[in-house]
A protein has these predicted regions:
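A general "terminal functional-core" signal
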Residues: 1-109
Length: 109
């Protein structure tokens, strides 16, 4: 769902909820999360105003909405993030949400 530059956390979460409603209708058997942390407001390429803790909420909402269908079948891929501090904080929030669902399994390819 395209969002304009300057999108705030609140507007992003509202859009995410609409996307998740459609995802639940689809009933996916697994998820591939392509997590781009360059949406963090501290990122030099950011055009959104997301905070690091927003990535916890994004992950939690997504996992909660789809848990009955995916049953923990989730792949998370790091996509972007160019401010190292913001990247570390945002990725930590994302991983914390995965851990909370007991779905975190580390595997090296």
């Amino acid at each position: 769902m395209p969002l304009p530059a300057g999108t705030t956390s609140e507007k992003y979460m509202n859009a995410l909820d609409r996307v998740l409603d459609k995802l639940v209708e689809f009933k996916p058997e697994f998820l591939i999360l392509s997590m781009g942390f360059d949406a963090n407001i501290a990122d030099p390429l950011a055009q959104f105003e997301l905070k690091s803790e927003d990535f916890y909420e994004i992950t939690k909402r997504t996992l909660t909405a789809t848990k009955d269908f995916t049953q923990g079948k989730v792949i998370s891929i790091l996509e972007g993030g160019y401010d190292l501090n913001a990247l570390a904080e945002s990725a930590n929030e994302h991983v914390n949400a995965l851990i909370e669902f007991n779905w975190l399994i580390f595997s090296a390819l």
